[in-house]
């Protein structure tokens, strides 16, 4: 048996597995324990207000001040984001996804990250109201 050929086949197989893992959606990398984390600041008005300021300082550059997304960055008001477990969003803030332009915010203290999540979750799928120009009937 040709051990070099067998070794080469194993390397190719390993490379394929690693590539498939790297290309998997980020949510597949979240462990059950991480996913089960619950935001200690959920639905707290003070935390949501603090999260809004933090969002403006750290997130609005890419996701837009209205969180509807900009420059090919995703909206955070979508049903997918709003249905995501708090722990999944926390994982993303902690780890980021540089392949898609999302930096890690692990340098921010945990309470700060949870406040940002409380704010994002408070947005729901609602979009800011658009003014109807004068003279236009609805």
Model-found features: residue ranges?
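N-terminal alpha-helical segment
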Residues: 33-34, 69-72, 98
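Flexible coil segments in periplasmic/lumen-exposed cytochrome c-class electron-transfer proteins
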Residues: 25-38, 56, 100-138
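Residue-level signal for mature regions of secreted extracellular proteins and peptides
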Residues: 15, 52-55
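Gly/Gly-Pro-rich "capping" loops immediately C-terminal to redox-active cysteine motifs
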Residues: 41-52, 64-94
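Short cysteine clusters
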Residues: 59-62
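Generic anion/oxyanion-binding catalytic loop in active/binding sites
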Residues: 11, 40, 78, 102-105
